[in-house]
Amino acid sequence: MPDITDKITQEYDASQIQVLEGLEAVRKRPGMYIGSTSSSGLHHLVYEIVDNSIDEALAGYCSHIELTIEPGDIICVSDNGRGIPVDIQPQTGKSALEVVFTVLHAGGKFGGGGYKVSGGLHGVGASVVNALSEWLEVNVHKNGKIYQMKFSRGDITQPMTVVGETDHTGTTVRFKPDPVMFEDTVYDYETLHVRMREQAFLNAGLRITITDQRGEEPVSESMCYEGGIREFVDFINKNKTALHPEAIYMAGERSDSMCEIALQYNDGYNEVIVSFANNIHTPEGGMHETGFKAALTRALNNYGKKSGILKEGDSISGEDSREGLTAVISVKLTNPQFEGQTKAKLGNSEMRTLVDSVVFDRLSQFLEENPAVGRMIIEKALTASRAREAARRARENIRRKNGLEGFNMPDKLRDCNDRDPSLTELYIVEGDSAGGSATQGRDSRFQAILPLWGKMLNVEKARADKVYGNDKLTPVITALGAGLGDEFDINKLRYHKVIIMADADVDGSHIRTLLLTFFFRFMRPLIDGGYVYSAIPPLYKLNRGKTSRIAFSDEERDRISAEMRGDNPNAKIDINRFKGLGEMDPHELWETTMNPETRTLKQITLEDAVHADEVFTVLMGEKVEPRKAFIEQNAKYAVNIDI
């Protein structure tokens, strides 16, 4: 971290808070400002306030941020930065503190005087959080005094008042989300913990402490990583076997931009690249990732040829160069341009040039100085290249077997009549008997059925050639029609709902996990785009006379049972547990699990790719000890276990 004491005296006052527009319509249209009023929007409130503190850290004025979840799901964020300005803001005649919390797009980022780079736009988040809180109070330690303001749903309830004296600087914000605005106001500790850990990795030397005071015993963790993103790579790779002991670290800057990259290869087959711009995760990549990938491939080919490891005519493709790679890319720039539907892609072309230059120069130097590591990486890439060629041959064999042009559809696929992918859905069903019931019960206009049978491949332990050669997965690849790995093209997807329908038992859960591992590793855009669903079949059928009802859980079974008894507590209710989808007749399967009007589908989403990678590695990978530890820690959360 930069030296903070030298910088505290630098001016950060009201003249650096620019007002762009009034705070309007936030409560009418909260989704425009925080994405949604669901759990993700609720947690976004915390990120907005923490981002303001991190801006202080980025500028070199803050070394410790404390986040506390108090009883009643009250949030408190405290930092030891300079403190939000309290003097009069020239444009409005109001205190800067009031402007920051009551005017949208009031912040110290816009003019360039307050912050060189910024993640949250300082002040934008504060006013939105204020508008969506039942109440909010802010205490600023500055100029030897403690200044306090209080608000309710965006309105001032206590003007700025001096409430004491202080010998330090900083800002503390406490707020309670407004239950009128949110579907739920209960915070998930783990969601906040993961985000805070990520920010601690990205800001080397910054200490972030998170505390949950809601339980009988407070839970607290203080995180500070002097190694920054190098330690982030170590964390991601902790359950994998690294090919070289330490992550390779590179950094460089140009004008008002800088980048840092850490990477390490492991003996697995999957690439994990996590990128950020101004501490904001960019899951769709962008120019910084493009520059990184191009430079990595060029540097490896260049060194391979110079060292004689690559023979004449040999070359390593981009995909091969990234097999088993874990990399974290972090860039900081003054005017980030975010693109894509979710603003999750960096569009600044100058970052491609900067990252490309830094990675090529630093990685080339590293390979020259560490020839043993260089040889290991290039030989792994060559092995990947041979496997990719074998996969290509396997693909060609399938094509030849099924006709000259493209894939014919799998024999077991019962396709639908409609050809518009946006209207169609593919049910991937466990077993032939369930597939038969599903085929008879479906609406053939828009529902296709693909039964799977036998033991499926665990792709966590397999390369692409093994995947293409697997007779259980080939039908899935063919039916979806969008390819695999780097060749996957979401525009060729034949169904926009891919629904896994498996029994509600251990075997069904295993099949779901194997399929999700496959989609995550080889068809990631399926999950990122929200195309994958899990059907929720009922667990029980309850009968009383001619009346039948179904239940999806033990609690629902008990409630329905009581309802069916009505005024006669001794009435006989026959309760049958469904052992499998194949036991249901076609009409039952349609009504309970396939009818869009009555079914329950769970969309598979990916909020934290690093955590998902860790879970798949632990559960499906080679190492036994991490899997055993995971099961011991999480057994209490398990459901649907047959004994």
Language-model features: locations:
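GHKL-family ATPase ATP-binding module
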Residues: 1-13, 23, 45-47, 55-57, ...
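Mature N-terminal segment immediately following signal peptide/propeptide cleavage
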Residues: 15-28
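Conserved short strand/loop->alpha-helix "switch" segment adjacent to the catalytic nucleotide/phosphoryl-transfer site
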Residues: 28-47
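Residues immediately C-terminal
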Residues: 55-56, 83-84, 506-507
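Short conserved segment of the HATPase_c
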Residues: 84-107
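C-terminal interaction appendages of subunits in large macromolecular complexes
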Residues: 386-405, 420-425, 436, 440-442, ...
